[in-house]
């Protein structure tokens, strides 16, 4: 099974996938941005993922995206791809999963995670290692809406199912509750598919 997990930066995808890995150690987890960074380091001398969208011309960025997709598509077994449905570039939104990419990846599921914008802002403040753009709550919500549209468009092109985990209006009763719920959802998706095989 191939699952693409998409959410805004600061949504906790890495934490979720660490929980998945604890329960299903044989699942391959690949971060699309990390694969792109390795390619961009060699070609453009980029040092940080957050520099890619600012320093690489869009036509070259597309080539890096495609090369990363080809590598990820070659992975076998259960694979979870950590990426973004849309990327903020030049004041607009660029598709993270355009047709030419999603048709190479061919995921079974695109899992979209959504949160209260305040939650995302707080998580971003706790992650000083990243060089993220500052966004207001309104901008974060607009970006989440863009993600939803892009996720469904990608699912159409990739003939994938979209699953939405919406944590808006659901405050955590304990630390990492949302991450645990999302991880359990992913684990169950994979286990159900394995049982059918």
Curated annotation (Swiss-Prot):
HAMAP family: Adenylate_kinase_AdkA (MF_00234). Signal peptide: none annotated. ATP binds at residues 7-15. Its EC number is 2.7.4.3. It is found in: Cytoplasm. Its main location: cytoplasm. The lineage of its organism: Archaea, Thermoproteota, Thermoprotei, Thermoproteales, Thermoproteaceae. GO terms for molecular function: adenylate kinase activity; ATP binding. The gene is adkA. Belongs to the archaeal adenylate kinase family. InterPro entries: Adenylate_kinase_AdkA, P-loop_NTPase. It is an enzyme of class 2 (transferase). It catalyses: AMP + ATP = 2 ADP. Gene3D superfamilies: P-loop containing nucleotide triphosphate hydrolases. One of its GO terms (cellular component) is cytoplasm. It holds the Pfam family AAA_17. This is Adenylate kinase. It comes from the Archaea. Keywords: ATP-binding, Cytoplasm, Kinase, Nucleotide-binding, Transferase.
């Amino acid at each position: 099974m191939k699952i693409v997990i998409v959410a805004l930066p600061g949504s906790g995808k890495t934490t979720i996938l660490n929980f998945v890995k604890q329960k299903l150690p044989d699942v391959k987890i690949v971060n699309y941005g990390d694969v792109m960074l390795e390619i961009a380091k060699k070609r453009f001398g980029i040092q940080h993922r957050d520099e890619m969208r600012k320093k690489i011309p869009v036509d070259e960025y597309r080539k890096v995206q495609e090369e990363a997709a080809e590598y990820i598509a070659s992975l076998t077994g259960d694979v979870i791809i950590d990426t973004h449905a849309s990327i903020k570039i030049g004041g607009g939104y660029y598709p993270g999963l355009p047709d030419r990419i999603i048709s190479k990846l061919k995921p079974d599921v695109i899992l979209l995670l959504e949160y209260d914008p305040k939650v995302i802002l707080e998580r971003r403040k706790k992650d000083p290692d990243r060089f993220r753009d500052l966004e207001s709550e309104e901008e974060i919500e607009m970006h989440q809406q863009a993600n939803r549209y892009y996720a469904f468009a990608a699912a159409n092109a990739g003939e994938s199912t979209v699953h939405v985990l919406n944590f808006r209006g659901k405050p955590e009763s304990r630390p990492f509750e949302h991450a645990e719920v999302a991880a359990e959802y992913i684990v169950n998706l994979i286990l159900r598919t394995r049982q059918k095989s």
